[in-house]
């Protein structure tokens, strides 16, 4: 029971659980069913999948604007440190006084012009505001003091030079008429809700796995479903805080900030966990995304050839097509075509799906080496990639992800990541890897070569026969003699 509790709950049994099993020769099937259906098991299930995903976003700024609490024994106020100079003319906080000077539209006007105290002394001084009381979205029913300029609730800013309106949003727009919006909704709060947003982004892919598994759906649906899971913090992030979010999640539901997790339908181009922000940002390049999928969920890691790489002077080492380059082809003949499935998703930190994309750019095809724009060099094949004269001639102007690809491989651009894992050969490989990953986790060791060719094959067949029901697979493994013999 101790080992089973550690694997299914992530903790040792309680005294009550030990007493319940006292006198029994073995843990009954009914008790195992009870454990697998418990909330503690699902907590452990999410932790398990987060470990497979290497869930970690570092301490990157996930949003455009943040507010922070500034306090000492005399003054306690929230403000946006990024815009202090923009609001007041110097890098200073607001004054400790209630702000009472507003125009007819309710916009704060300066309480003191040409303020000359402290860091504002000299020159034109500072344009100073006081504080206002605000109910922050992350703590409804409470009030905090926020510098008046920072707390501006208006959604319209200074008109652009051509007269077009400017909208205040999470970017702040470098506009002194833009604050954090109604109830500070365009700013995240360090020390208050930043950690909740960060944790929710890491948790989202694991929640997709949980929803698929709890519903008894085939495990593979986690890589293809349009649905995702959101709680209040995550829904607010997608609606109001995400600085680069064009993946149609600005239409996330308007949930209470403390709302629990629930399913939300995304656009048709989404592919389960493979197009969540947490996955795409954690693995920011298409090659990294392919590598994690193959390593963690297909149990097929990419490894350098045993003979090492050929000399850099070898003609074959100069091939700009990695899928054919000596020493690279053994991995990249698989990696490069697979990256095309993510070709409409931007690389880097942005969460952007490119609905409109030019697969060929004439300007990029015809620019001379050393004279191509950054845009061309970033997205298209240009002469900058030329390793020998004429080596890129047939591919010039093509989108990088489509270079040296066959017509069938190019079609993957429209199909997306879900089409990659839906291939019959990968469905079988996903199933086998799911069984192997879980078995090695609970056995505390790698499967032997003999087990992989016999026992794993049998367990995978059972998994497939049960419709890829992950819970049935878990029960099958933990009731197996191999697991029961673990000391």
Language-model region placement:
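Post-BTB helical module
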Residues: 1-9
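Active-site substrate-binding loop specific to GH73 endo-beta-N-acetylglucosaminidase modules
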Residues: 8, 12-445, 449-487
